């Protein structure tokens, strides 16, 4: 139990794992998984560890997916990219823009690897991965069999996909296929983007605006460890939203397909005067209440306690119960984040 996980999670929480293995190709990943499984150890496959909270020491092998490579196919209607799961997401966004292939600019500066992007169906500023995903290539860990899922088969939802359910432990993502249409359409529905002129705006301007919003509002994990948005934006019924808006008319709300309404978790937390609130070494970020940070050598217990406190306060005031977006990892694998902080 002497391999520190601190360098492998952006929260900077100091727990250990029995073994840590970096896999640079599919075969190395399979070998590491099969070796650990033969020894009866649990196995966790990580990208950049930017969406996990380790609750305790991990009693098994952590495999760091570093499968690289970008292939481009130029078709009349779109560019098709085949991207290794271990590629850094933001670097991919920058690369596609430099090469004149826009479409990912709203997703700039999302931390993590390409392989993690479909698991969460990452999204920001009005765009989700499912908008550009063509397929996801996986390998079945027990057999080494390769499987390609179409975007539809990935069953994408809000911060959700098949990879959080039946594909969670049996498969590893090795590559993601993206389709970037040549007829670029800007998405300018959120934040500062609403001020841009859709008729003249360029992809680079959207990218710059997104980077500006993220860097001014969000803490740098190198300075204060964090895992980005800690909570999901809650999606509530039309009735619940109507009652809440009657009482709090300024609450940001985004009607969804099917009649439900998405609320802004950061706003709900902010209304409870929780910005800057600290428990142990963990704190609510002063600029963006949705982010919990490692202010001062936080222990995982500090983060859990703080998340519980935030959830209670928001629940008591608004009767809306927040769910973590961050994935909680126990000694032998993922555990329910909601149960942990309830």
Curated annotation (Swiss-Prot):
> Top EC class per UniProt?
oxidoreductase
GO CC list: cytosol
* EC identifiers of the protein: 1.3.1.98
One example of the protein's molecular function in GO is: UDP-N-acetylmuramate dehydrogenase activity
Q: Which GO terms describe its biological process?
A: cell division; cell wall organization; peptidoglycan biosynthetic process; regulation of cell shape
Q: What family is reported? A: Belongs to the MurB family.
Which HAMAP family does the UniProt entry name for this protein? MurB (MF_00037)
Listed name of the protein: UDP-N-acetylenolpyruvoylglucosamine reductase
């Amino acid at each position: 139990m002497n391999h520190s996980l601190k360098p492998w999670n952006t929260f900077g929480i100091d727990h250990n794992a029995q073994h840590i293995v970096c896999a640079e190709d599919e075969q190395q990943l399979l070998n590491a998984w099969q070796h650990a499984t033969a020894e009866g150890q649990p196995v966790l496959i990580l990208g950049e560890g930017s969406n996990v909270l380790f609750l305790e020491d991990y009693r098994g092998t952590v495999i760091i997916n570093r499968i690289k490579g970008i292939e481009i196919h130029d078709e009349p209607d779109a560019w098709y990219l085949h991207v290794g799961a271990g590629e850094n997401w933001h670097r991919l966004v920058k690369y596609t823009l430099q090469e004149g292939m826009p479409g990912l600019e709203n997703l700039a500066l999302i931390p993590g690897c390409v392989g993690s992007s479909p698991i969460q169906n990452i999204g920001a500023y009005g765009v989700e991965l499912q908008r550009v995903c063509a397929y996801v290539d996986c390998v079945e860990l027990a057999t080494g069999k390769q499987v390609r899922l179409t975007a539809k088969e990935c069953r994408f939802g809000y911060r959700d996909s098949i990879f959080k359910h039946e594909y969670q432990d049996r498969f590893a993502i090795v590559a993601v296929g993206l389709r970037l249409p040549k007829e670029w359409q800007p998405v300018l529905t959120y934040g500062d983007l609403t001020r841009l002129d859709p008729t003249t705006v360029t992809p680079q301007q959207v990218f710059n605006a997104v980077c500006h919003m993220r860097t001014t509002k969000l803490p740098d994990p190198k300075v204060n460890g964090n895992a980005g948005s800690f909570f999901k934006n809650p999606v509530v019924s039309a009735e619940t939203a109507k009652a809440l808006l009657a009482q709090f008319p300024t609450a940001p709300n985004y009607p969804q397909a099917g009649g439900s309404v998405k609320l802004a978790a950061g706003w709900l937390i902010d209304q409870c005067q929780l910005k800057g609130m600290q428990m142990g070494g963990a704190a609510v970020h002063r600029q963006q209440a949705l982010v919990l940070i490692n202010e001062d050598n936080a222990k995982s217990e500090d983060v859990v306690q703080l998340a519980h406190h935030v959830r209670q306060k928001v629940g008591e005031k608004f009767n809306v119960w927040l769910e973590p977006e961050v994935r909680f990892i126990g000694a032998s694998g993922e555990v329910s984040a909601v149960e942990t902080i309830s």
